[in-house]
From Swiss-Prot:
Belongs to the NDK family. Keywords: ATP-binding, Cytoplasm, Kinase, Magnesium, Metal-binding, Nucleotide metabolism, Nucleotide-binding, Phosphoprotein, Transferase. It comes from Pasteurella multocida (strain Pm70). One of its GO terms (molecular function) is ATP binding. The keyword ATP-binding applies. Its cofactor is Mg(2+). It is found in: Cytoplasm. The gene is ndk. The keyword Transmembrane does not apply. ATP binds at K11, F59, R87, T93, R104, N114. This is Nucleoside diphosphate kinase.
Length: 139
């Protein structure tokens, strides 16, 4: 199986609650290698661009407001089967239905304040990684 890369965002709710270390520890325990990281305070334009696929949905303004409310930690994670394994590790978007032991079940507040973002496909991962990182920033 080939090594893949996926984008992870540790979202504002987790950053504000000082959960970065606990979440990074989960990534490393699951065999992910951090190959890039940067702390960002997204602008409105950056948040709108990143979530452009949701711009016609009713929740879009609240999502953007949340994502610019505090810094995020953007990460590129690498391992075999990274996209699928990361999605399994973080759990369902709604923490109330996320599996026991997943990051969202353990740390999220609700479906919007759900602590982490993860790419949902290899194509999304490539696009999302390129949104935040240039190749020279990935090791």
């Amino acid at each position: 199986m080939a090594v893949e890369r996926t984008l992870s965002l540790i979202k504002p709710d987790a950053v504000k609650r000082h959960l970065i270390g606990a979440i990074l520890s989960r990534f490393e325990q699951a065999g992910f290698r951090v190959v890039a990281a940067k702390m960002l305070h997204l602008t409105q334009a950056q948040a709108e661009g990143f979530y452009a696929e949701h711009q016609d949905k009713a929740f879009f303004p609240e999502l953007v407001a949340y994502m610019i409310s505090a810094p995020v930690l953007a990460l590129v994670l690498e391992k075999e089967n990274a996209v699928k394994d990361y999605r399994t590790l973080i759990g369902a978007t709604n923490p109330a239905v996320a599996a026991e032991g997943t990051i969202r079940r353990d740390f999220a507040i609700d479906g919007r304040h759900n602590s982490v973002h993860g790419s949902d496909s290899l194509d999304s991962a490539k696009r999302e990684i390129a949104y935040f990182f240039v190749e020279s920033e990935i090791f």
